[in-house]
A protein has these predicted regions:
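Residues that cap or initiate secondary-structure elements
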Residues: 27, 40-42, 54-56, 70, ...
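Polar, enzyme-active/binding microenvironments
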Residues: 38-64, 89-97
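Intrinsically disordered, low-complexity Pro/Gly/Ser/Thr-rich segments with frequent PxxP/GP/PP motifs
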Residues: 53-87
Length: 108
């Protein structure tokens, strides 16, 4: 089994929920860290979710405020394990307001 560290990014996330990362087939992924930066001119509320093929979708963050010009480092030593076809999603209450960085390790 190979372990590969990767960085996934998504710029200008807004009101429409965006898929930041979809786990490839035959892969398990460990989410090591998520950083959300507010690039808008005002504060905004963000959400992070996990969509699963089994329809057990969950919110990991919901309506968490990020002040103007600030960022939120989400995970702080915790890990989340994602399985094949799981999707990590992000949204905001303000259009084009969030840049997201996702640090992961894929196990193939």
């Amino acid at each position: 089994m190979a372990n590969t560290f990767k960085l996934k990014t998504k710029a200008n996330v807004g009101i429409t929920t965006q898929n930041v990362y979809v786990v490839p087939s035959a892969t398990t992924t460990v989410v090591i860290g998520i950083t959300l930066a507010n690039t808008s001119g005002a504060g905004c509320l963000v959400g992070v979710g996990i969509t699963r093929p089994s329809s057990d979708d969950v919110k990991v963050l919901k309506n968490v405020p990020i002040p103007q010009g600030s960022s939120l480092e989400f995970m702080s030593g915790n890990k989340v394990v994602l399985e094949a076809a799981d999707t990590l999603t992000i949204n905001s209450d303000t259009n084009n307001s969030i840049d997201a960085s996702l640090t992961i390790m894929e196990i193939t």
